């Protein structure tokens, strides 16, 4: 277990088992229990690794949003694994996934979270064009510095230029 307290891990395991039990009853078959990991960084709350039958959760966002993770994020990621096991490769938030979210877990098929991400958000850098300013992530900023990418304003079509200002 990485960066997570035992009690929180226990609650996550309980939620995971409850989801698989619901799916087993609903589909009248036995699904393998997914592996739970806390090795996810950035702004994503969770991610399902389909071939590995693994769910990775963002430990920082989990600590800050315990109830939502247990009631929404874990079922969301389990639904991805179930969709893959039942239907193979289909659209990530397509009709099959939505039917599992709504039919099995009785949850809305939301595709994104609304968590505050200030604690996990990386550094941003200010870029500008003729008409406005843009915050670029550190990943995009580094690509510009290494001459691997350039970014263009969709409005004025000018290449964005670094202002020299780090925003966060």
Curated annotation (Swiss-Prot):
The keyword Metal-binding applies. GO terms for cellular component: cytoplasm. PROSITE patterns: ZINC_PROTEASE. One of its GO terms (biological process) is response to stress. Keywords: Cytoplasm, Metal-binding, Zinc. Binds 1 zinc ion. GO terms for molecular function: zinc ion binding. Pfam families: SprT-like, Zn_ribbon_SprT. Zn(2+) binds at residues 76, 80. Residues 18-161 form the SprT-like domain. Its cofactor is Zn(2+). This is Protein SprT. It comes from Vibrio vulnificus (strain CMCP6).
């Amino acid at each position: 277990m990485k960066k997570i307290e035992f009690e929180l891990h226990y609650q996550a395991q309980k939620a995971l088992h409850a989801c698989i039990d619901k799916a087993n009853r609903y589909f009248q078959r036995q699904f393998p229990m997914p592996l739970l990991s806390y090795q996810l960084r950035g702004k994503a709350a969770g991610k399902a690794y389909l071939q590995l039958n693994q769910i990775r959760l963002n430990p920082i966002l989990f600590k800050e949003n315990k109830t939502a993770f247990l009631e929404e994020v874990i079922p969301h990621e389990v639904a991805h694994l179930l969709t893959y096991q039942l239907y193979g490769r289909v659209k990530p938030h397509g009709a099959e996934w939505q039917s599992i979210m709504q039919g099995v877990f009785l949850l809305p098929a939301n595709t994104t979270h609304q968590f505050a991400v200030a604690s996990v958000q990386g550094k941003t850098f200010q870029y500008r064009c003729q008409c406005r300013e843009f915050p670029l992530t550190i990943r995009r900023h580094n690509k510009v510095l290494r001459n691997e990418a350039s970014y263009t304003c969709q409005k004025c079509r000018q290449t964005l230029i670094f202002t020299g200002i780090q925003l966060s």
